[in-house]
Amino acid sequence: MSRIQEILKRAEREGSVHRTRPFAAEGPAVGSPSAAAAATVPMPAMPPLQAPEPRSVEAALDRRLVAAFSPQSLAAEQYRSLRTRVKSAEHGRAMRTIVITSPNKGDGKSLTAANLALTMAQEFQHRVLLVDGDLRRPAIHGLFGLSDTPGLSDVLRGGASIDDALVALPEHALTILPSGPLPSHPAELLGSTAMRRLLETLRTRFDRILIDMPPVAPLADVSIALGMVDGLLMIVRAGVTPKPAIERALSGLDLSKVLGLVLNDAGTGSASYGYGHEYVAG
């Protein structure tokens, strides 16, 4: 049995299933240039990264962020369960940086990333950063009622310092790095030396870094950036995302970094999660 088939079988067999409120599909695509392997391109030097002093704001959060608005709800409890499973999947490896993605658009990846980040930030003295790495259809700033600039693309292109781009939400003990303006070559930017340097620096300042990234198919963004992070969660819409689409998405990834599948069913008025940390190759 192939590794991909093993992941799918275990997701069906071992994933715990819970019911909670539905996720809404994400917004319309801004544009999706064809995928291509990141070329080595000269990148402008980033401004020196100093001790972060993020802007503090009172964000107008989307009501679907149940981890903030309804922390005692069943829906919020499922995010806490997912947080626990991510921790148990570490197997002695430090999962400081985790990519959140999906096979296709509309699977609810951004909402999952936002709620999971809020839940992780609720842990005592846990420094959590949520990065909007979807430089094609950014959604994180909208969920938190923030401006998308300055942001990640500004920092990577040398147009802003990390201090300018980070946004602190003191009430939720969470820090956000918005997307910034949409670049013309997002895959190359995400695979750049500047991105690697930025993540190395952020790892020293945060306990968890969640990166919301574009869907895997048909884009190269995730596969290019995967070598810079510790793990990946794949968000799948139960009953909607075709199994071949999941297989195609997994086939282009380093499966040793796939922590598991999160099953999200938005079409029936409920959401279910199946997550199996045993999917991970040791």
Which role fits each region the language model picked out?
Residues M1-G282:
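P-loop NTP-binding module
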